[in-house]
């Protein structure tokens, strides 16, 4: 009977699974039985563990000592940062300068009054040879007038003056130059919508060169006409002076009676004439 009961219990235990979790708390002193005489060992162990914990806490609370390499490296990185910022600033400033150079200057119409003001400023500065674009710009003091405008106009004015230097038709040349300037302004207004990088820019440059060549030809023709006029006037003056020198006063007189010349109508070669 006992054998049968034990077999039945074994079968029942094998058929029903064990669903217990078997959770146990960690026991650091499992191998050591707790007896009355071993309290000193447990107290010493607990004291040693507490001392270890306090030592660890003090270790974490105490400030760490270092040799200073990290701090020195941090200072060096801080020292290099302004240089990097300076380089970035230089790069940004250079990019801004490039953008300003790429931006096209607005067109300026040189009217007759503005050109007269320009000529007056150049004359006050001592002529076109001594005047500089910056000084002319400061003396004119015109709104929306840039240094590039004054520089190009002064260069054109110098070329016209140098080609027609010393010619008597200087006023005519200035009028022709003003007319050419107005024609160039009209051409620029007509081509204002086109871009400088377009293929039409070459044709515009050709027309400007043709206008410059035509102004030079006109100035040369005016100067040649003036010189020819001077040559004719000088030639007529020389002829008049020659005619004046050929005319002499008749200061001839004879010695003797006044009726002697009437008696002898035919002049003889032996008569002596005194000329003064």
Curated annotation (Swiss-Prot):
It is found in: Nucleus. Residues 30-52, 161-220 are annotated as: Disordered. GO terms for molecular function: DNA-binding transcription factor activity; transcription cis-regulatory region binding. This is Probable transcription factor KAN4. Residues 171-183 have a biased composition (Basic and acidic residues). Disruption phenotype: Ovules with a single integument instead of two. The keyword Transcription applies. Plants overexpressing KAN4 show reduced or absent ovule outer integument and color alteration of the seed coat. InterPro entries: Homeodomain-like_sf, KAN_fam, Myb_dom_plants, SANT/Myb. Expressed in the periphery of the primary root apex and lateral root. Probable transcription factor that regulates carpel integuments formation. Required for the specification of polarity in the ovule inner integument. Modulates the content of flavonols and proanthocyanidin in seeds. Residues 185-194 have a biased composition (Acidic residues). Keywords: Developmental protein, Differentiation, DNA-binding, Nucleus, Transcription, Transcription regulation. Residues 195-220 have a biased composition (Polar residues).
């Amino acid at each position: 009977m006992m054998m049968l009961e034990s077999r039945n219990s074994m079968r029942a235990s094998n058929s029903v699974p064990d669903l217990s979790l078997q959770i146990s708390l960690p026991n650091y002193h499992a191998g050591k039985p707790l007896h009355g005489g071993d309290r000193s060992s447990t107290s010493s162990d607990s004291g040693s563990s507490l001392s270890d914990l306090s030592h660890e806490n003090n270790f974490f609370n105490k400030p760490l000592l270092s040799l200073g390499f990290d701090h020195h490296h941090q200072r060096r990185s801080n020292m290099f940062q302004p240089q990097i910022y300076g380089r970035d600033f230089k790069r940004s400033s250079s990019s801004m300068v490039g953008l300003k150079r790429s931006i096209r200057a607005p067109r300026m119409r040189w009217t007759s009054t503005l050109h007269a003001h320009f000529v007056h400023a150049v004359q006050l500065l001592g002529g076109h040879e001594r005047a500089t674009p910056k000084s002319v710009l400061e003396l004119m003091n015109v709104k929306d007038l840039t240094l590039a405008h004054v520089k190009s106009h002064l260069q054109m004015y110098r070329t016209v003056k140098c080609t027609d230097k010393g010619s008597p038709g200087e006023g005519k040349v200035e009028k022709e130059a003003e007319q050419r300037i107005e024609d160039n302004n009209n051409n620029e207004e007509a081509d204002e919508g086109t871009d400088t990088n377009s293929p039409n820019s070459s044709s515009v440059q050709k027309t400007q060169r043709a206008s410059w060549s035509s102004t030079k030809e006109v100035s040369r023709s005016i100067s040649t006409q003036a010189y020819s006029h001077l040559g004719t006037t000088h030639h007529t003056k020389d002829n008049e002076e020659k005619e004046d020198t050929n005319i002499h006063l008749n200061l001839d007189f004879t010695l003797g009676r006044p009726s002697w010349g009437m008696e002898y109508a035919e002049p003889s070669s032996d008569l002596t004439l005194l000329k003064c």
